[in-house]
Amino acid sequence: MSKKQKNETSAKAPVKLTRAEKKEIQAVIRKYKGDGKPHSAQASIPYEAMYQDGICRVTPRTFSKCIEFTDISYQLAQADTKTAIFENLCDLYNYLDASIHVQFSFINRKIDPKQYAKSFEIRAQGDDFDDIRSEYSDILQDQLVNGNNGLMKRKFMTYTIEADSLKMARARLRRIETDLLGYFKSMGASAWGLDAKERLEVMHSIFHPDGEPFSFDWKWLAPSGFSTKDFIAPSSFRFGNARMFGLGGKYGAVSFLQILSPELSDEMLADFLNTENGIVVNLHVQAIDQSDAIKTVKRKITDLDAMKIQEQKRAVRSGYDMDILPSDLATYGQDAKELLKTLQSRNERMFQLTFLVLNTADTRQKLENDVFWAAGIAQKYNCSLVRLDYQQEQGLMSSLPLGASHIQIERSLTTSSVAVFVPFVTQELFQGGDAMYYGINAKTGNMIMLDRKRARCPNGLKLGTPGSGKSMSCKSEILSVFLCTPDDVYICDPEAEYYPLVKRLHGQVVKLSPTSKNYVNPLDINLNYSEDENPLALKSDFVLSFCELVMGGKNGLEAIEKTVIDRAVQVIYRPYLANPKPENMPILADLHKALLDQHIPEADRVAQALDLYVSGSLNVFNHRTNIDIKNRIVAFDIKELGKQLKKIGMLIVQDQIWGRVTQNRSKGKATWYFCDEFHLLLREEQTAAFSCEIWKRFRKWGGIPTGVTQNVKDLLSSPEIENILENSDFICLLNQASGDRKILAERLNISPQQLRYVDNSEPGEGLLIYENVILPFKNPIPKNTQIYQIMTTRLGEGATV
């Protein structure tokens, strides 16, 4: 037989396998084919690829993108503001068609408390203030423990579409993102799209609820052979239990909200999120095609009518009235017809909603307690929170902001019913960097940390009745500035209230009175006094304001009087501008002489008014400045100036501080100015105009002024108050009198709910307005601390300095 024939014979011969060999081959096939179940934590995470621009391929034809958005003050807003937000939210939902799946994710996760606490720690400097630094840090730590700032609360919206390719998906996802960002902007919320690294960090935070830091870089993928899932997956998943699961060293459970209530509340979602524990709440929303929704409702009505006919036939056969129908049948029929009317005649659509709640905890018992608490919230609103039996893995993966729901438990709701789950509660003010402590949010218990320098206009006002805590609020802010920044602080102190604090901080108190040997020259000027080339223009405004106060009268200065004063100003500063030496600085006597030298009645009239302040008993300001201000914190005590000189003293102090602002600007240093009884500077027309001009200039020159007053009516009656309010992005409202509350509510657009926080409020409690945010706050300072002792003005409580 030839070799070729042998090969053909052997090829045709069947290969017989033993039973053992067949079993072995089948086992190998099963091993490599797999059982369809994930065998690693990474394999359990249900997405295929994450692209650097933030697009995620969830399935071969499904792509998603994620938006993060900020909270806004919804619960305490005006009724019309709430309505506008709700209507905009309805418009957002109606924008979605059946091809877009939307997932709202609300993630409250704990962060490392030790790392978090470090941001409030004020380091010792080895000076006389370390004990105050330590005590102040302890107060902040206590507020951190008592509040909810151990949680980071974030809000996301993930939207998913189907597409044949990444290129097609990318184009449509971008268009949708642009539209959605517009809806959030119309509601007053900031929103932005997330890139891939940011999306991975969010999923990592869900899988690592203990706050483990996230580390990832695209450069690491190729050399390591890892996928993006390797950087977010926990050490393990354990899904053996029907009603809970293991997540690394943690325990978790997912429940769904069974909506039973006939009416839903816009506070339900807020209550779920108002917890001290880590929680993740997800709303999966799928729009139904409008024509399909109407057909479905019509079919349901037809079915109900058929059931009604059957019941009527049964009634006739049984011999009782055919109009007597089962109550449920009558109710369902009426509801279905109402729903059909809503879909056909109103701007409403149908949606399928899946509401999921994910709880995680360190122990099983803690987990059960957290789930029980969440169930209590649902019960409060006549709903039920039901644990997902044997679907914990699907529930967990549906809680990832991937835009895919693996839970088929859905509830049909109309647009307005879905929009009732308003994704906003109250805006927090918690800035990083050089932010300072301003109390705690009375609504949420979270700390308020602000950096006024970041505001568009950091100027501020503090308003409140006597005993409401105005001076305490100012002193708390002054202490924060002193301990946390290198800035200078100046205080105009009409009641000598700041002496203990200033002395304890080794500051300087400049006492101005008719008998004092401390002198401040109101005509002081430096070459940086104005941003214009000619510093005399602004100084002339000051001198006009000064003369207006000196002359009194209801109508202010006449035009000719202003002219002669301005002419005199040009004359008296000529020697100093030619040779800027201290001895060439003019004083009031020089102004008096320059007026008399004009030999016209108007100039003589102004000069006569100045006599009292030049050669009379009130000549305290007719001297060259003899105080050397080199301290970081300076208080001008004008208590003993008396009623006649108080307003003049305040104006002069304001001008002196403006000079310091101009000097500090060249050093790159901010200057804080606290002016008590600020309303006195806004009574006379010229003085109010000058004060308003200075108020505007402060911002440009690195000054941060704060006006303080208890006479809100006087303040708001000034013709310049609109300019003051427009140039003040920080307003602290403490307890207000009844009439003042109404005026402030109208001027500052404060809702009745917010107004309650300044109605008979305790000292140190009220409303904080920062740019467009209005927050209720309270700022308790423990009485058993040194800080309280040097701040309080209550008789018998203050420190002896």
Q: What is each of the regions a protein language model found here?
A:
Residues 470:
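Conserved lysine of the Walker
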Residues 72, 79-98, 109, 271-273, ...:
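P-loop NTPase motor domains
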